[in-house]
């Protein structure tokens, strides 16, 4: 199973890239973790936000292909680390690749939300989207370590 994080936004600060890549490189070869960045639509004072969201959503879903779609969204389901580890096992047993979607400044398109089979909430807080990349990478690595009895996770 491959996990792909599909996120709106490019040109992240160096600390985001460093943090994400630190956890990305730790993933085992049988569970590659990939990042696909979708360029954000141009936003100005007269921007058509609905159209921008639609374009970003189409690009995200095209990048996902036939993978299982999981959105990262405040109204989603919050998971503890053990629950995320269970989700990881369920995703592996499903046999499909998994695509995790992080929207842009206005969130995810209605189409992305409609196609999603699951929605995961990291927090009831609104988090900066660059930070979400690092938190997701670490959380998934921690969940993987729990499923394999790797010493990274400690109760």
UniProtKB/Swiss-Prot annotation:
Catalytic reaction list: pseudouridine(1915) in 23S rRNA + S-adenosyl-L-methionine = N(3)-methylpseudouridine(1915) in 23S rRNA + S-adenosyl-L-homocysteine + H(+)
Binding sites annotated in the UniProt record for S-adenosyl-L-methionine: 72, 103, 122-127
| CDD domains, per database record | RlmH-like (cd18081)
Q: Which GO terms describe its molecular function?
A: rRNA (pseudouridine-N3-)-methyltransferase activity
> Can you tell me which family this protein belongs to?
Belongs to the RNA methyltransferase RlmH family.
Assembly: Homodimer.
What's the protein here called?
A: Ribosomal RNA large subunit methyltransferase H
Task: Specify the species.
Answer: Haemophilus influenzae (strain PittEE)
């Amino acid at each position: 199973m491959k996990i792909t994080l599909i996120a709106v936004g490019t040109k992240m600060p160096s600390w985001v890239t460093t943090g994400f890549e630190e956890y990305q490189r730790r993933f085992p070869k049988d569970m590659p973790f990939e990042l696909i960045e979708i360029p954000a639509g141009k936003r100005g004072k007269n921007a058509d936000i609905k159209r921008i969201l639609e374009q970003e959503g189409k690009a995200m879903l095209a990048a996902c292909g036939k993978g299982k779609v999981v959105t990262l969204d405040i109204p989603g389901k919050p998971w503890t680390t053990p629950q995320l580890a269970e989700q990881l096992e369920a995703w592996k047993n499903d046999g499909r690749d998994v695509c995790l979607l992080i929207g842009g400044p206005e969130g995810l398109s209605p189409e992305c939300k409609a196609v999603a089979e699951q929605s995961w909430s990291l927090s009831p807080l609104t988090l900066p989207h660059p930070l979400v990349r690092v938190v997701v990478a670490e959380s998934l690595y921690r969940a993987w370590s729990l499923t394999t009895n790797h010493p990274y996770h400690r109760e």
